[in-house]
């Protein structure tokens, strides 16, 4: 698409500012298809909103629990775009989805509690729950053709199970869940009394042929123990502004989130300018989100076509997110070793599977980010193909 080509990417700025395994942290000449972040600038309306607010020079204390307009906009977007009956009074703005996960864990977990975490899944589930003193048990993510199955989940629940981490859409697999499986998860929560940490940070990044189903569509009565986290980094490309929120379905759980967040004491909380940017994103930025989904759809389809013709690698078709999760077991290489080889010899950086980022269930895989131009992605895949051809021809 015209708005998402190399012409729109300022590589000099990325080399200076884009950290977390990206352009500012790799040697010159290396292409980073690593952390799930955009290579493109955010919507111009966000820049205009920040510039307009800053020019007056006033940055006073604001509402401890977030700007009312921001909370209303969040609830409205959840209702309109995801069919979630969210009330603004139960939405707590927070400084990033990652921080929101920690707030949920701190609010509802005690040392000695057990938590079920899918394997593989983003490491922040394990990190936030462990930080709160909980013990982690892993549930193997069962990838079906068109969804991740929850079959057998009940067998992993014990009397100590206090919380389940639920990534919807799933990172790194990029897959969704059926309504039947969501109903099953809520039924288990009602039966055993555990909480659900419901991560929906990827819920706007849905490919055109797929449909996102949310736990919250079943209504607040079914979601009494569901705590949802949302962030702006994937949807709007503003990771450095650290904009997110957590939301509950009742006053009791909301109050616990507020207490754990420490916003009323002003120790915690989201800053003023992040909320100004967040309002602009929600009120004026979704057109760009929809355009961006078209871009990543083209990138996904191109990447899968290229990978299908490469030796030693295969990849399922994701329904959501802007990452792909290829299987590289045929190469016979450990993912960490392959990623190091790619970076040092072929000048391509990607994310290895394994314990560090996604859990032991991600062994034999790598993750590749698609949130860039076709030109950058094409060259990155050229380098991946060259590496794999060299490896497989030497076997």
Where does each model-flagged region fall?
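Glycine-rich loop-to-alpha-helix module at the N-terminal edge of alpha/beta enzyme cores
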Residues: 57-59, 73-76
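PLP-dependent class I/II
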Residues: 4, 9, 25-31, 36-53, ...
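Disordered, acidic Ser/Thr/Pro-rich linker "stalks" and the adjacent N-terminal cap
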Residues: 11-13
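Extracellular beta-strand ligand-recognition surfaces/modules
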Residues: 1
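Phosphate-binding beta-alpha-beta segment of Rossmann-like dinucleotide-binding domains, i.e.
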Residues: 79-81
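Short beta-strand-loop-alpha-helix junction that forms the active-site gateway
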Residues: 15-18, 372
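Short, surface-exposed loop/turn segments at secondary-structure junctions
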Residues: 60-62, 290
């Amino acid at each position: 698409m015209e708005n998402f080509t190399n012409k729109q990417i300022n590589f000099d700025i990325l080399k200076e500012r884009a950290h977390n395994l990206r352009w500012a942290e790799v040697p010159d000449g290396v292409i980073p298809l690593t952390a799930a972040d955009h290579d493109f600038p955010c919507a111009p309306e966000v820049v205009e909103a920040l510039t307009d607010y800053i020019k007056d020079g006033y940055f006073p204390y604001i509402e401890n629990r977030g700007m009312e307009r921001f909370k209303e906009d969040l609830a409205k977007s959840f209702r309109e775009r995801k069919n979630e009956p969210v009330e603004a009074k139960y939405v707590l703005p927070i400084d990033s989805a990652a921080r929101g996960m920690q707030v949920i864990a701190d609010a509802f977990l005690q040392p000695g509690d057990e938590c079920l975490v899918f394997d593989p899944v983003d490491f922040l589930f394990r990190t936030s729950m462990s930080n709160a003193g909980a013990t982690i048990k892993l549930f193997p993510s069962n990838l079906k053709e068109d969804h991740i199955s929850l079959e057998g989940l009940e067998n992993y629940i014990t009397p100590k199970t206090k919380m389940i981490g639920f990534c919807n859409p799933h990172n790194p697999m990029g897959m969704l869940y059926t309504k039947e499986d969501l109903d099953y998860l809520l039924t288990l929560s009602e039966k055993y009394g555990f909480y659900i940490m419901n991560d929906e940070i990827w819920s706007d990044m849905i490919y055109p042929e797929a449909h996102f189903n949310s736990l919250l569509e079943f209504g607040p009565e079914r979601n009494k123990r569901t705590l949802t986290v949302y962030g702006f980094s994937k949807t709007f490309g503003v990771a450095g502004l650290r904009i997110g929120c957590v939301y509950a379905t009742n006053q009791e759980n909301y109050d616990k989130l507020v207490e754990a967040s420490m916003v009323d004491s002003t120790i915690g909380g989201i800053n003023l300018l992040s909320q100004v940017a967040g309002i602009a994103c929600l009120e004026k930025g979704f057109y760009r989100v929809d355009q961006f989904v078209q871009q990543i759809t083209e990138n996904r389809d191109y990447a899968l076509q290229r990978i299908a013709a490469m030796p030693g690698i295969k990849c399922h078709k994701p329904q959501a997110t802007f990452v792909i999760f290829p299987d590289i077991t045929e190469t016979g290489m450990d993912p960490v070793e392959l990623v190091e080889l790619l970076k040092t010899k072929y000048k391509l950086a990607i994310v290895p599977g394994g314990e560090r980022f996604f859990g032991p269930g991600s062994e034999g895989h790598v993750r590749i980010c698609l949130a860039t131009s076709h030109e950058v992605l094409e060259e990155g895949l050229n380098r991946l193909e060259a590496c794999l051809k060299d490896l497989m021809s030497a076997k």
